Regions:
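Nucleic-acid modification enzymes, centered on SAM-dependent nucleic-acid methyltransferases
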Residues: 2-53, 67-286, 300-331, 345, ...
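Core SAM-dependent methyltransferase catalytic element
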Residues: 354-358, 377, 381, 403-423, ...
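Conserved beta-strand signature within the Rossmann-like core of class I S-adenosyl-L-methionine
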Residues: 321-322, 357-364
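Charged low-complexity interaction tracts in eukaryotic proteins
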Residues: 428-430, 472-515
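A short glycine-rich, Lys/Arg-flanked "PGG" loop and its adjoining helix->strand segment in the class I
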Residues: 339-355, 380
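A short acidic, leucine-rich amphipathic alpha-helix
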Residues: 439, 453-462
Length: 515
């Protein structure tokens, strides 16, 4: 493959979020890129045997898809919880899931009757159980939490039931089997705690933790106690489905001699827990063939704070927490801290790439100064922006998005850069910076009058303004953009979540009068 001749992807690839059992349903996580989109990008920009890196690895979608495509995957994340999920799902060492099912039956023999007894127990009986099981220390939680201490996240019944299952898992002698059983247990924890918000009008079990929707430890006003063993059994079934899928792909590749070659996680997957801005010491300059990454979006999610629920009980210690690239959180990181971490991480990505290789960064935020950090960091290292695609996240929207539909960005921008053999000079238009109105007048005619999403316009404006050195003129809030669109005769369709051109004569006259 001649990397210089690769035509960049210039179209949005629709998400197929539920097609892969290895990612969908096996374990919740804060953000997760659609695996079919990631897979398409990895396949397009790299070859079998290439080194593919994700410096902000999360739940491992990039690394797992790269490994299954025969690449050598490097997954990096400061969060041990993220690395645990990735390692467990990706592991190809089992011959089949027969041993795993047998291990699950052994867990049932050790604790099933005790767990069922807990579900019927009185308060006095529950106290007796809690005094005789191994529990983690009752540590203090982040200030933003509704609960002050760790145990406050659970009802006594949930705490006792989860402890009984984990104690039974901990005596499993096989490390690989124990890790997969803990993955199912860990996924159960997400449902068996007081942050679980049951979906109204649906079965009690249909819902999710506020940790993954509101992004804080918000306790439910109506506590739901789901059946403990059945919840664990259901999560285990999802782990079995994920592992069967991984092993089928492995066996097909290894038996048929598919282009990606033999798949072996021990040879093809490396898990790191480093500061993304300091990977050079671990990997070396010009050592990577492709990078696909999704850095944190400012202060949206305090990943390490919100992972205490799992890291603490699983016994994982968090190193380098002061290197987390976020705004706020328990350590109250400043915006300057975030921008510095983002800038250094992106610059490091370009340095890690071999010449004539590609980098894709997924990002979205109303604060265009964050985009400027990314775009400038790549340009300063000699990289060239080749594609900027808006990915429409066609998923169930958060409550915040539903209530503020026209002001919240629901999609993301996929920025793809190329690192030439010779360092590129920063070449951008030096003409007079364009105002917001000038940018709107230039880019609106190119959008369909039948409708477009806010993020589609915003992303076009962002790239256009950066190329004209005018990003500072986009430092406006969402309301101002909405007002400018209405002045030009556009209306927001709250049902379809798109802007439509109002072609009525009265609306056109009103729009002209407002201007």
């Amino acid at each position: 493959m001649n990397r210089a001749e690769i035509e960049p992807i210039q179209r949005d690839i629709p998400a197929a979020r539920q097609e892969a059992a290895r990612h969908y349903g096996v374990h919740p996580y804060f953000t997760r890129r659609p695996s079919n989109v990631v897979r398409a990008y990895v396949k397009h920009y790299s070859c079998a045997g290439d080194v593919v890196l994700d410096p902000f690895g999360g739940s491992g979608v990039t690394a797992i898809e790269a490994m299954l495509l025969g690449r050598r995957a490097i997954h990096n994340d400061l969060n041990p919880f993220a690395n645990f999920i990735t390692t467990a799902i990706a592991d190809t060492s089992l011959e089949s899931t027969v041993q795993l099912r047998e291990a699950f039956r052994a867990i049932g023999e050790r604790c099933y009757s005790k767990v069922k007894a807990v579900e019927r127990a009185t308060d006095t009986e529950l106290n007796g159980v809690l005094n005789n099981v191994s529990l983690p220390e009752n540590i203090r939680l982040p200030r933003s939490s509704d609960a002050e201490f760790f145990y406050d996240l659970f009802t006594p019944r949930q705490l006792a039931g989860l402890a009984l299952i984990k104690n039974a898992i901990d005596v499993e002698p096989s490390h690989n089997l124990r890790r997969l059983l803990l993955l199912a247990w860990s996924a159960s924890v997400a449902k068996l705690n007081k942050t679980f918000l049951s979906a109204k009008g649906r079965a009690e079990s249909r819902g999710g933790s506020s940790i993954f929707s509101i992004y804080r430890y918000k306790l439910a006003s109506d506590i739901v106690e789901l059946p403990i063993w059945e919840t664990f059994e259901g999560r285990f079934a999802n782990v079995i489905a994920a592992k069967n899928e991984i092993l089928r792909i492995r066996d097909y590749s290894n038996v048929t001699g598919a282009p990606q070659g033999h798949i072996n996680s021990h040879r093809q997957l490396t898990i790191l827990s480093q500061d993304a801005a300091d990977l050079m010491n671990e990997l070396g300059q010009a050592s990577v063939d492709y990078i696909f990454t999704d850095p944190p979006y400012g202060g949206h999610i305090a990943y390490l704070d919100l992972s205490i629920l799992w890291n603490h009980w699983l016994g994982f210690s968090v190193k380098n927490s002061d290197a987390e690239a976020i705004v706020g959180g328990e350590l109250r990181f400043s915006e300057d801290h975030y921008k510095a971490k983002l800038r250094d991480s992106i610059r490091q990505c370009v340095e890690l790439l071999r010449p004539e290789r590609w980098l894709t960064v997924v990002f979205q935020h109303w604060d265009v100064s964050y985009f400027q950090v990314i775009l400038d960091a790549v340009a300063e290292e000699g990289g060239v922006l080749k594609a900027a695609i808006t990915h429409d996240k066609d998923v169930i929207w958060s409550m915040h998005k539903k209530k503020n539909a026209e002001n919240v960005l629901g999609g993301e921008m996929l920025l793809t850069f190329y690192k030439p053999k010779e360092r590129a000079r920063v070449m951008r238009e030096s003409k007079k910076p364009s105002s917001l109105d000038e940018l709107l007048d230039e880019y609106l005619p190119g959008l369909p009058t039948t409708g477009f999403r806010t993020e589609s316009l915003f992303n076009k404006l962002t790239i256009g303004a950066w190329e004209r050195q005018s990003l500072q003129n986009l430092a406006v809030d969402a309301q101002r953009v909405a007002q400018a669109l209405r002045r030009r005769g556009w209306e927001y369709d709250i049902e379809q979540h798109i802007w439509r051109k109002n072609t009525s004569e009265s609306a056109s006259e009103l729009a002209l009068a407002d201007r």
